[in-house]
Curated annotation (Swiss-Prot):
GO terms for molecular function: DNA binding. This is Sugar fermentation stimulation protein homolog. It comes from Vibrio cholerae serotype O1 (strain ATCC 39541 / Classical Ogawa 395 / O395). HAMAP family: SfsA. Belongs to the SfsA family. The lineage of its organism: Bacteria, Pseudomonadati, Pseudomonadota, Gammaproteobacteria, Vibrionales.
Length: 244
């Protein structure tokens, strides 16, 4: 996924009201931009970090600029625009870069399904195998305190919506379709992923139950730069002991 036109650079002053951020430009001016991320963004929104943003030519938008990437003071690259995760996974599937998801004939997005009025991120179909329902989650929370190098967690805040998605995926698996939770690792420092039991215990428990019901968990990491982001490798998923 190439950024075109090229992203522009600034310095983060603050993020506020969840969806807004003030950014200082190199000429000293300050602009307010949209932040497409509902999470806590722990470690992704520290004042003083370098941010890279896109600009829309849509005159109807209240905020023309969108925060896309953070370049931390530790040197990590993070994609904070969660809307990019789904598009990135779709691109990787169509290019055959996710080997577990090859062999399907049709791909749809945002399809209604389930008993809780949900929409699946990606639906794959084939005449020769069951439908494949894929829920994509963006992973950007890096544990830099415990000394376990490269450990990433999801979620970074309590997510009732994410809990609902796990229940829906489990029901799909029980009905005989293929059901997948795909963690898109969008932080250059993360090398492995675990459920954040210390943040959302209910989500962790539901994830374990979903796997027991037949839901598959995949974790793929993206390569990130100011020019492009793309899926490059599979990383490990494992449960962790509760943090004290």
């Amino acid at each position: 996924m190439h950024f075109s036109p090229p992203l522009q650079k600034g310095t983060l002053l603050k993020r506020y009201k969840r969806f807004l951020a003030d950014v200082a430009l190199e000429d000293g001016s300050v602009i307010t931009m949209h932040c497409a991320n509902t999470g806590a963004m722990t470690g992704c929104a520290e004042p003083g970090s370098t941010v890279w943003f896109s600009t829309s030519d849509n005159p109807k938008r209240k905020y023309a600029h969108s925060w896309e990437l953070t370049q931390t003071q530790a040197g990590h690259w993070i994609c904070v625009n969660t809307a990019r995760a789904n598009a990135l996974v779709v691109e990787a599937i169509l290019a055959g870069e996710i080997q577990q998801l090859r062999g399907y004939d049709a791909l749809s997005t945002e399809v209604k399904y389930g008993h809780e009025n949900s929409r699946i991120d990606i639906l794959l179909k084939s005449d020769s195998q069951p439908h494949c329902f894929i829920e994509v989650k963006s992973v950007t929370l890096l544990d830099e305190i415990q000394g376990d190098k490269g450990q990433g967690y999801f979620p970074d805040a309590v997510t009732t919506r994410g809990q609902k998605h796990l229940r829906e995926l489990a029901e799909v698996a029980k009905d005989g379709s293929r059901s997948i939770l795909l963690f898109a690792v969008l932080h250059s420092g993360i090398e492995k992923v675990a459920p954040a039991l210390h943040i959302d215990a209910n989500y962790s428990q539901l994830l374990k139950a979903a796997q027991e019901a037949g839901v598959e968990v995949l974790c793929y990491k993206a390569s990130l730069s100011k020019h492009e982001i793309r899926m490059v490798s599979e990383v490990k998923f494992a449960y962790q002991v509760t943090k004290n």
